[in-house]
């Protein structure tokens, strides 16, 4: 029940590029982002940090590090331009920071797609209690 409440809060507070990210994940993996990756492993989801449990979890750790490099925009609030072409994501934002945010989201969606074979349903709703300290970016 608590998990459903958390997911509901996340859905209500969505704006900017988060919607773009969710759409990228859906197109690239065929999986609904919040349900399948919103609390996955030790690094997917808000305020989660820890040693990645598998390749899918590593995708989230890399995405967090990518976002940390952005200094002139807030990728969770500001939207950017992109399109899908021949199964690939093409970022087309003129603002350099937002274009980099798009590239970060493209990278994680592509990483999820490339690691579908390592996706572990047992990690889908990981609370982070058993996550060890992560290395810095």
Curated annotation (Swiss-Prot):
Q: Where is this region: Important for membrane-damaging activities in eukaryotes and bacteria?
A: 121-133
- Recorded protein name is Basic phospholipase A2 homolog W6D49
Tissues and organs where the protein is expressed, per its UniProt entry: Expressed by the venom gland.
Give details on activation and inhibition.
Heparin reduces its edema-inducing activity.
Q: Name one GO molecular function term.
A: phospholipid binding
Q: Which organism is it from?
A: Calloselasma rhodostoma
Q: Where is this site: Hydrophobic membrane-disruption site (MDiS)?
A: 130
Question: The organism sits in which domain of life?
Answer: Eukaryota
Q: Which UniProt keywords apply?
A: Disulfide bond, Heparin-binding, Lipid degradation, Lipid metabolism, Myotoxin, Secreted, Signal, Toxin
Q: Where are the transmembrane segments?
A: none
**Leader sequence residues:** 1-16
Which Gene3D superfamilies does the protein's record reference?
Phospholipase A2 domain (1.20.90.10)
- Per the UniProt record, the site (Important residue of the cationic membrane-docking site (MDoS)) maps to 121
Grouped into one coarse class, the protein's main location is secreted
Biological processes, Gene Ontology terms: arachidonate secretion; lipid catabolic process; negative regulation of T cell proliferation; phospholipid metabolic process
Lineage, uppermost ranks: Eukaryota, Metazoa, Chordata, Craniata, Vertebrata
Gene Ontology CC: extracellular region
């Amino acid at each position: 029940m608590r998990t459903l409440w958390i997911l509901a809060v996340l859905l209500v507070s969505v704006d900017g590029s988060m919607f773009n990210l969710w759409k990228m994940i859906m197109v690239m993996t065929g999986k609904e982002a919040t349900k399948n990756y919103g609390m996955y492993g030790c690094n997917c989801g808000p305020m989660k940090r820890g040693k990645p449990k598998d390749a899918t979890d590593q995708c989230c750790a890399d995405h967090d590090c990518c976002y940390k490099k952005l200094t002139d925009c807030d990728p969770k609030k500001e939207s950017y331009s992109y399109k899908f072409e021949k199964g690939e994501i093409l970022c087309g934002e003129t603002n350099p920071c937002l274009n980099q945010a798009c590239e970060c989201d493209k990278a994680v969606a592509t990483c999820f797609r490339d690691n579908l074979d390592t996706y572990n349903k047992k990690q889908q709703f990981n609370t982070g209690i058993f996550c060890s300290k992560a290395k810095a970016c």
